[in-house]
């Protein structure tokens, strides 16, 4: 059927697939390097405990049948290997059905991880990667030209990502409507990057322009994705430019990058397509059936978008096939950070020798400049930001985190930048205190070299020791 394929988008498909495989690789690498302390058998929220109380139908996963740290590591590293093979173009060397099965592997593996990932995998970009990855299975390889309906599904997904984010802002915090949110956002965002301090200190009129441009990109430009070329390519380019601006302004895991990847599928490159065979009938039937299913399931996110009680980052099915998205419906005006400290003193005193644990990405030492980590995702650091917003976010895991520090747990300490205690000599007590952080001014930066100024607010976790721990004299 001639209308079924769009040969002019063969290069867009190639670029999209290779870029998506890179995002998959980062996601699996993040899982492989961090899971043991977070989700492992002795993790902060162990998978075995989770699967005991959550049935397969609510959280389908390979780990519902069996879990071990070795099996999880094997799945994560296998995901890395398959993703690397896809980056290298292995799918182009396989028959069409083989390429589709190969693309199904990272989706199934990552679904298994996300569905047991609990609070550590509760971010919108997890579902976004899964939804994008599922659609990508049906894009085909060099044997056939890209199917029109799959290209449409990718645009439909990109539309929901951008338009949903725009709507949640207009319905949420009043500062988005007043164009003032960026007076605070760069300072209070979850994980600032190396340029965030400078973004915060841009002139306020420029902040207004930033917010207005963001509204146009998220509320107007998405409709242009469904217009003829070259307008659709221009719309995609505007979205890519906006996302790259966000990449410079902070660490948002791979959220910005996978949005860029989706936009790349819209671009029509001025290159003649190679010859490709007609799509086999079985492929047409499968693609059309999947497209019909996804469009039917889309009624739920559409209903959510038009609702005045719109929610963001919600999955409507356990396979994460069609989801709703959004970001920063509300913006914090004040930044709080939980500072974790330990002491080797025999008794905890306020004026004792308390030493601070340093995190990789979370602000801590006021003189330490934020680093660039995205698209790599520091899950513990992100959840520490939520913990500072409310202890309720940290309820399931923070006490266990303190316990692991007292035990000198190697896996947990590897998530941190530095422990103030030498290996084998953990602290007797651990405590946590809440501080208010603000960016220094240009003058303060020149005089002190510090990018942050912090003020003590209150105790977060009182001095705690291991239950039944013997005195060490």
Locate predicted features.
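Alpha-helical membrane-anchoring segments
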Residues: 1-473
